Structures are given as structure tokens and as C-alpha cells.
Amino acid sequence: MENNIENFDPSLVYFGDRGQDFKKMIRSILSLGMSDEYIPYLTTPESLNTYNTAFTSRGADDKNNYEMFEQLGDVSVNKFIVNYMYKRFPQLRNPNGVDVVAKLKIKYASKNQLQMLSESLDMWRFITATYDERTNKKKPLLEDTFESFFGATEWLIDSFIEDIALKQGNNNTYVGVGYNIINGILTTLFDRINISLKYENLVDAKTRFNEVIAEQKSIIGDVKYEDEYKNGKHTSKIYRYPPNSNLKELLGIGTGTLKRDAQEQAASRALETLALKHNIIKEAPDRFKAFM
């Protein structure tokens, strides 16, 4: 057994389930924004073959993988998020709200957010990828597959509508029908999310930490990140070097499978330390206060 573990090849491929459960998963997602009578058109063997590609990483298959659909889906998902935020929060429909919507887009189109949505839709067990990818790149895989699913769905619908038009002798193109469907699915998903317009919820901890350092540098002094990677885990420590002192103070420690996640956690704890021990608090910028 030990020899098997030692000789295990992480480049080997995990093949996601492509049986009835895969079809049920596709149907369940489509039903969030599509009438049941039309779903069978997207669960034909040909369509499921497209979804198979949309759930396959490049590491698993360098020729038939989700990269094209992920690129298409990335554009559509980002467009949806901006439009959705203006519809959900009409008070942001003005020049002062543009920056807030930009922050909303960064947060809700982020790897963390999209991978959580992907997991909530039970996509993980259906993703075909190398064992190395599934072990060390879970978040990127989930994010890419989420975007790829919507890119593939939009592509399938537009292609289906175009084929019907051509058979009827209509050479017009009907771009946008597919987006309308995925817009409905995404709206259902995002309506379930409790979205806050508070500055501390919109702007990541590392950015807020950097801002407070810039504003209070004369009091806080210099700051340094010390990062370490060991046994598949990143550890980040943040130290401050107070002015006119030879001492250094540990402000926060963070860990994560990704370096930026470790730094984000460390920055969050550093903000807490500055507030609790030194009464240094990062105030929300005026452009955010109007919407909080």
C-alpha cells in the first residue's frame, strides 16, 4: 500500500460522472431560469457532449476542454453581475454609485464567490480533471467550470435558435436568446445571496489594510509581510515596525492553500489588532457612506 502511495501519479485523470446524475444536475440548474418544456433540447446526447467538454479541464484533455466556454461564460457572468447590481440597488444608478458597483463586481465575480456557487450547484463531482488539479486547484476548477457551464448553455441555445432559423430559410442571427436564459438562472442564484453595501463587506481586508497603513503611516510605521509555503499550505505573517523603535509587532497571521488567501486572512486579523490594541480604525470613504 505504501508503495502505491509513493508511486501515485498526480497527472492521472479523475473522470467526472457522466451518467444520469450528470444529466439531472444539468436539468436542475437549467430549471432555475428555463421552462421545463425546453430543457429536453439541452439534454440531448449532442448537448450533453457539449456539457461534458464544459466540465473537462485542460489538464485532463488538452484538445477538448472547457477553455472556450469558460472564456464566453466569463464575459456573460461579469456583464450579468454589473446589470444585476444596478437593478437590485437602484440607489446606485448615479456617478457616485459606479465605484460601489465596481467593488460589487470584484467581490461577486471573484474566485471565492463563484466557486461557492459552483459547489452549491453540486458541480464538483462532475468535473473531469487531473488528481493534481483537484487536489491543489479546487477553487480555480470550480470557478472555471461555473463560467464554462454558462458559456456552454448560452452557446447551445443560440446555436439551436440559429439552426431553426436556417431551416426556415431565415438567415438572420438571433444573438442574445441564450444570454436571456442564463440571465434568468443567474438572477435566481444571486437573489438568494445576502448582499451588503457596507464598505467593510465590499472591499477585501488586504486593500483596507493597505489603505489604513497609507493613511496612518506616521503612527503605524513600516509594515512587512513574511510568507512561507510548507506541506501544501501558505502561511502569512504581518509585522509592523513602529516609528522610532527597534521593536516589531506581530499584527496578524493567516493560512490558506493559496498565498493570497493567507495574506487576506492575515490582513483581516491585522485590522482587528490595530483597532483593538491601538484604536486605529479604517473609516469608510465618503463615497460609500451614502449607500450604507
Curated annotation (Swiss-Prot):
Principal EC category: hydrolase
UniProt-listed InterPro entries: dsRBD_dom, RNase_III_dom, RNase_III_sf
GO biological process: RNA processing
The reaction(s) this protein catalyses: Endonucleolytic cleavage to 5'-phosphomonoester
Pfam families linked to this entry: Ribonuclease_3 (PF00636)
Presence of keyword Zinc-finger: no
PROSITE patterns the UniProt entry points to: DS_RBD, RNASE_3_2
Highest rank taxon of the organism: Viruses
EC number: 3.1.26.3
GO molecular function, one term: ribonuclease III activity
Gene3D superfamilies: 3.30.160.20, Ribonuclease III domain
Residue stretches spanning the membrane: none
Residue stretches making up the DRBM domain: 204-276
Domain RNase III intervals: 32-158
Record's keyword terms, sorted: Endonuclease, Hydrolase, Nuclease, RNA-binding
Function: Digests double-stranded RNA.
Family membership: Belongs to the IIV-6 142R family.
Protein name per UniProt: Putative ribonuclease 3
Species in which this protein is naturally found: Invertebrate iridescent virus 6
Classification lineage: Viruses, Varidnaviria, Bamfordvirae, Nucleocytoviricota, Megaviricetes
